[in-house]
A protein has these predicted regions:
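N-terminal secretory/targeting leader peptides
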Residues: 29-126, 135, 143-342
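Short beta-strand-centered segments that line the small-molecule binding cleft or hinge
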Residues: 129
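C-terminal segment of classical bacterial N-terminal signal peptides
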Residues: 16-25
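Bacterial N-terminal signal peptides that target proteins for export
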Residues: 1-11, 21-22
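Alpha-helical scaffold segments in soluble metabolic enzymes
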Residues: 138
Length: 342
């Protein structure tokens, strides 16, 4: 009788759970496994490159909130998919998720070159405001058309590490083999007199070591994580001013997203949005930590002031901005949308 009464008492509880849409615990056999790829060094949820940590935080929280219905396998360091192939893999549904420098795909989707347009973004808050403005909605639509969904918005500032001489003003770039990370950034550096070599950030160490590159522009996180301080003699940081801001979001294949239940989709988007505060905090910390790490390694540390920034911006408008406006479909309209966000 006691067992029967206990079971009867549980009936309304079970019914309430069903009605509320709360996910029920999943067995290992029933769980959906989602694979996440990225090109950055692997670590733990508490230590290492913040991008790897963010991915692990996302996976842990989504698995917790879905009661194990969704589980994740994380592949750092380009171990599953090569860096520049990740968006294509998302588009075809061959890969579930990635944290990815979107401008890497500017050849396939020219419009996304605006996400590493030199001197367009001038501070983090401006970049994050794109999300709810027309430029952000247009970017979301473009990615949707390519079977890709933005889960977490991440903007990163960056600087330049060099082993020949300091690079502060545009003229310092003349005659050097340089890497800007995207078409528009490379156009600026070319206009400044640099010779462009395009490599993903996880190959910059070997490129600089072998002499393929004299200078590397990349995010503060990558300048530290890929240990370029072991090779550089000078670094110009982003802690005061920089023309280098890159959109590097956490993305999911729409094929994967559409295969989730409405409740699972809701959890994925909520967790993704919740990690944006962690991302911006980590990036600002990395901008400062970069100077500390490089200084400790004996590298000469430099900063950019407003006057120098305006020199780069003038050259960017004459080169990368103009090319984008003239040669990309709706390029002028997209640039106007972006510049409307302050």
């Amino acid at each position: 009788m006691k067992i029967k009464s206990t079971l009867l008492a549980l009936i309304p509880v079970i019914a309430a759970l069903v009605m509320s849409g709360t996910p029920s615990p999943a067995s290992a056999a029933d769980a959906k496994v989602i694979k996440i790829s990225h090109q950055f060094p692997g670590g733990t949820i508490d230590k290492g490159d913040f991008r790897d940590r963010l991915v692990r935080m996302f996976a842990q929280e989504v698995e917790k909130r879905t009661h194990g219905q969704l589980k994740f396998e994380i592949y750092p360091g380009g171990s599953l998919v090569k860096a520049k192939q990740q968006l294509d893999a998302l588009s075809t549904g061959a890969l579930d998720m990635t944290l990815y420098p979107l401008a890497y795909s500017g050849g396939k989707i020219p419009e996304v070159n605006i996400t590493l347009m030199p001197a367009l973004i001038t501070h983090y808050e401006q970049g994050y405001r794109w999300k709810n403005k027309p430029i952000g909605k247009e970017l979301t639509r473009l990615l949707d058309e390519n079977n890709v969904k933005i889960i977490t918005w991440i903007w990163q500032a960056g600087g330049v590490a060099s082993h020949n001489k300091p690079i502060i003003v545009p003229a310092d770039t003349k005659g050097l083999k340089v890497r800007g990370a995207g078409k528009s950034m490379n156009q600026l550096l070319e206009a400044a007199g640099g010779a462009i070599s395009s490599v993903p950030s996880n190959e910059t160490y070997s490129a600089m070591q072998s002499g393929v590159l004299d200078a590397v522009w990349t995010s503060s996180a990558s300048l530290v994580s890929f240990r370029l301080y072991e090779l550089a003699k000078d670094v110009t940081t982003a802690r005061k001013k920089t023309f280098w801001y890159m959109f590097e979001p956490l993305l999911m294949s729409k094929s994967t997203y559409d295969s989730l239940t409405p409740e699972q989709q809701k959890i994925v988007m909520q967790v993704g949005a919740s990690l944006e505060k962690f991302a911006i905090k980590s990036c600002k910390e990395d901008d400062k930590r970069l100077a500390e790490v490089y200084g400790k390694a004996g590298v000469h540390v430099h900063d950019m002031d407003e006057k120098t920034f305006q020199m780069w911006r003038k050259l960017a408008k004459e080169s990368a901005w103009k090319d984008f406006e003239d040669n990309v479909k709706d390029g002028k309209k997209l640039m106007e949308m972006a510049q409307a966000v302050k």
